[in-house]
């Protein structure tokens, strides 16, 4: 995904017009190459190359390294696009649809409330929440529920079974970075398309977003001021998401 549901601040600052192309860039990206490599006798690497639906056709790679025990390392890379004057990116990462029963979230990051690049007012710790509690019922549905500086997160059903997502090292730099994430009963697209809360349907799935980064939410005012420059994501700079996935 390269998009987030617009906030009231985004609309007031004109971000909808400026960043409209990012709403479709990831949603309609097309796979242009697949590469499968055995890694010895116990693991395999599968790399998908996607072409973003923008004029520059920037290529993003998604690499899965899976072993026979079910452990998966996921590496998602955006190289930065210096051709053309692209607007800054709202968000970059992966959004998955999960069965509706996987609504519980435990994470090690800053919380327990939602946090953003320019709203890190919370404490670092291990927090328990759920997809329904994390969704703020704004009059106009919008971006909500993000958690920053996450080291690991566990998404579970009421029986305690689920998925663990944890930070891992980048294969090229060796650097390990925290990630941003959210678990909500609605996708970014569903939140963006609804004009009122009662237009959101009864939840049938959960939506897990795991992001390399997301721009800030601003708030100097809600009718003109943009997100401060240091909390935006320049399109000409690379972005990398590196996480490990384990079922339990």
Residue ranges and their predicted role:
Residues 1-248:
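Beta-strand/loop-rich accessory regions of lumenal/periplasmic or secreted enzymes
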């Amino acid at each position: 995904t390269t998009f987030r549901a617009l906030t009231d601040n985004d609309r007031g600052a004109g971000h909808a017009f400026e960043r409209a192309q990012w709403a479709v860039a990831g949603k309609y990206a097309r796979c242009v190459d697949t590469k499968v490599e055995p890694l010895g006798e116990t693991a395999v690497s599968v790399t998908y190359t996607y072409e973003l639906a923008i004029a520059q056709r920037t290529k993003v790679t998604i690499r899965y390294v899976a072993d026979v025990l079910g452990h998966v390392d996921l590496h998602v890379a955006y190289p930065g696009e210096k051709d053309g004057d692209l607007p800054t990116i709202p968000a970059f990462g992966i959004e998955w649809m999960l069965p509706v029963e996987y609504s519980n979230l435990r994470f090690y990051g800053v919380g327990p409330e939602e946090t953003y690049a320019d709203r890190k007012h919370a404490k670092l710790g291990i927090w328990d929440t759920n997809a329904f509690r994390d969704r703020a019922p704004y009059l106009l549905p919008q971006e909500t529920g993000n958690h920053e500086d996450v080291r690991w997160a566990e998404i579970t059903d009421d029986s305690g079974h689920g998925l663990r997502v944890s930070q891992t090292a980048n294969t090229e730099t060796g650097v390990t970075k925290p990630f941003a994430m959210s678990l909500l009963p609605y996708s970014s697209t569903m939140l963006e398309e609804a004009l009122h809360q009662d237009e959101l349907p009864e939840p049938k799935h959960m939506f897990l977003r795991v992001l390399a980064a997301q721009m800030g939410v601003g708030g100097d005012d809600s009718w003109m001021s943009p997100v401060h420059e240091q909390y935006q994501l320049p399109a000409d700079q690379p972005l990398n998401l590196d996480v490990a996935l384990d079922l339990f």
